[in-house]
A protein has these predicted regions:
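Conserved end of the kinase activation segment
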Residues: 35-45
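Short proline-rich PxxP-based motifs
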Residues: 73-84
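Conserved C-terminal C-lobe helix
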Residues: 85-98
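Terminal C-lobe "cap" of eukaryotic-type protein kinase domains
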Residues: 100-104, 108-124
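Hydrophobic anchor on a C-lobe helix of Hanks-type protein kinase catalytic domains
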Residues: 58-59
Length: 130
């Protein structure tokens, strides 16, 4: 599955430092803690947060944050149905993506190398489905 939204895309010179943003583009349910606090933010850590929220929806069917205050504080609440099994390594990846401190939050290299994702496509189909 690939999800892409180019609504706020800009061309960035890779030799220049990544810019900070002050305007928010998107849906608040997926907005990073620093964005909700109206702090200047960098796009890569904010996008990793969004990935964490998306993982919660895909794995549990629910948002990891009951309220905006919970999102700002990084208080994750996993509402998992008894019939749903979320692998511990998947939950660990989601929590790394949802760290309220953008400096401590996982980066794309950590996500890409995470044990839950590495080798997943080598598994038989029935083992890839949660």
């Amino acid at each position: 599955m690939k999800l892409v939204d180019f609504g706020s895309a800009v061309v960035v010179d890779p030799s220049e430092p990544r810019p900070s943003y002050t305007l928010f583009f998107g849906t608040t349910a997926y907005a990073a803690s620093e964005v909700l606090q109206k702090k200047p933010y960098r796009a890569p850590p904010a996008e990793i947060w969004t990935l964490g929220v998306l993982l919660s929806y895909l794995l549990t069917g629910a948002s990891p944050f009951p309220t905006e205050r919970d999102a700002i504080a990084g208080r994750v609440s996993l509402a998992v149905h008894a019939s749903v099994h979320v692998p511990e390594s998947a939950e660990q990846l989601m929590m790394r993506c949802l760290d309220p401190d953008p400096e401590r939050r996982a980066n794309i290299h950590e996500v890409h190398a995470h044990p839950w994702l590495v080798g997943a496509m080598d598994l038989p189909l029935e083992e890839r489905i949660l």
